[in-house]
Amino acid sequence: MLQQAGHRVYVAESAVRHLCRLSSAVERCFTVPSPRHETENYLLEMERLVQAWEIELLIPMCEEVFYIAQGTERLGDHCRVLVSSIEQLHELHHKYDFIQLAESLGLSVPDTRLINSRQEWLEAQPVLEMEGEWVWKPVYSRFAARVRMPISSTADFDGGASDKKRYRGNMKQYRLQNGPPGDVEISVASPWVAQAYVAGQMLCTYSVAYEGKIVAHTTYDSRYRTGSVGASVFFEHVEHEGVYEWVRKFVHATGFSGQIGFDFIETEDGQLYAIECNPRATSGIHLFHPGDGLVRALIAPYEDELEKETKVVTPKQGSKAMLMLPMLGSVLQQLWGKGSLGAWITAWRGTRDVVYQRHDVKPWFEQFAVVLSAWRLARKHKLSLTEALTHDIEWNGEQR
């Protein structure tokens, strides 16, 4: 979109293989040090590139935003940087601090408890299980990595046993599968949260904000994922006034500027609960098309109607997108799980692949090399494929 709007696009990436590497929409790609593992060298190289190529706007696209935010003082001397402060980003990224903030603003969120150690986990777990079902996850995580979902109380572990006996069997199974992480994985510096499980439909958002005002927004259905609770691979724009109002109030109250996303659960009776915040670009960006106005929202949000919030840029009604390869993988869940193959086929038909572009096909072939590279890294470091894809850029609260 940026290139089609007449802008020159330069990409700085720490991974050797990435989708933009061969794209005809990119003027030039640069390989930079890992933001996570070589933060100072990364920021030095970014500053050099910004100066050398006279970059006017720097747009972080994933968790490198947290490292860029730590270098805004030096980078901001040379170009506009589309980030908020590192202090604000940290608060929103931290899964417990975000919940506390949203609750203080009077916005609906699930009951969420902070767990700082294995001992706290062991003490809290039996008490919480008496109250209901809980989701356990690290406060610093992304794409549902390491999330532990509760085992359904209706799963038939004990065959024809009574409901009461079957429920007890479930809880025993849940305890066996939900032992505390190792001491290295959970600590005061890297705690977990236990969040009350809310049954309902998952809805996600992507917004561009400027000084507390939304200038671009989409709410989207993300019903197909990698695994049962993994990263989204299918995105469909939906109009949802309740979600938009929740996001608008939050952005206004915090004065946020930059790209931001939220994950919501909507219950059967229409109650909305925000469960996480992603203070960065999310997959909802794929739902915008050239001409929708997103480029203007990113580059010049302070102009006229956008600044006054008289017009919020949104995707066209019915806009859909998917990541084709992992979407194909999700069909197995429909065949062997609880999904509907017919619904999956309906979703597939007429949905564009975000990687494939008829006039720019090289990124489509490059994705196989990207996956292979991530698979090798995953094997080497004993990571999931999703974790391997963000291994060099993820941020877990570290400060320079």
What do these predicted regions represent?
Residues 8-10, 109, 192:
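Hydrophobic anchor at the start of a short beta-strand
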Residues 79, 87-112, 122-127:
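Glycine-/Pro-rich loop/turn segments that contact NAD(P) or position catalytic residues
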Residues 152, 158-229, 236-245, 266-273:
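Phosphate-binding site of ATP-dependent enzymes
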Residues 296-400:
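Peripheral (often C-terminal) accessory segments that flank ATP-dependent C-N-forming ligase machineries
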Residues 252-287:
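Conserved metal-phosphate-binding beta-hairpin within the catalytic cores
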Residues 143-144, 223-234, 278-291:
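Glycine-rich phosphate/pyrophosphate-binding beta-alpha loops
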Residues 1-84, 119:
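ATP-binding N-terminal substructure of ATP-dependent carboxylate-amine bond-forming enzymes
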Residues 102, 126-147, 186-200, 217-221:
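ATP-grasp fold ATP-binding core
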